[in-house]
Amino acid sequence: ECWEDWDLIVNQLAKQEPFHKPGTAQGYHAMTFGFLLGEIIRRVDGRSVGTFFREEIADVFDIDFKIGIRENEFERCAEMIMQKAPINVINFARRIPRWLLPSRIRMIGDTLSSAEYRKAFIEILRSEDQIKNVTAFPNTPQWRKAEIPAANGHGSARGVAKFFSILSNGGSRNGQKLLNKETIDLATTEFSTGPDKVLFQGPYKFGLGYMLDAPLSPIGLENTMFGHTGIGGAAGFGDKVNKIGFAFVNNKQHGIGKLYRTANNLTKSLYKSL
């Protein structure tokens, strides 16, 4: 019930000490990154991140994407069908000596039980009821109305692809400027690389807010890509060399074995057509 209490969340974040010494490790900020940047926007501009995005970006460039939605917009939202936690895999991993496990299962088991993963994905749930009902939580009014910049944006594939297309074509569209080209170049420069202590120890590469290489996903299939993956198989990216934007969004999460398979196939077909 606290997701709509922005002040509570950012005040708790301000009190939080770094989980490891800055510069010594990479750990994906599944939730906190959006609140950190959103609070900077609010303090500089006065508007919430959702209002700022709507008035300065979505409305100006006709991008079908929102951060925090109103109740009269719920009818446009597809119900999320969440993938249940792989309990059988986890229980199997706990019973078998670690050295006998296949490397993929060992990696998953290590990550799901790690302190970094739990802090990023589990301990943010404030009650046992939320943990038990995590698969239904994204469909609740509280989640949809809250402004959670790193996690609960709502939009269409066309909207996400258009956003990345603008960035991939110099940052302007129809005489309106979204970002300077120099800013885009800086944001898509590599600043951090894995192994990521939250994301399965994978060799993820990040710019400023953008993934530059994300194992198993489309991002990184070409070294000219920048974008971000989504939990359950979604992905959006831009390509400044080929001047394209792409997005695949799904309301039913894909399981671990099929994760990003559809997005990868679509991406490969896209690049074959260029």
Language-model features, listed with the residues they occupy:
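Short hydrophobic "helix-edge" motifs at membrane interfaces and signal-peptide entry regions
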Residues: L36-L37, A146
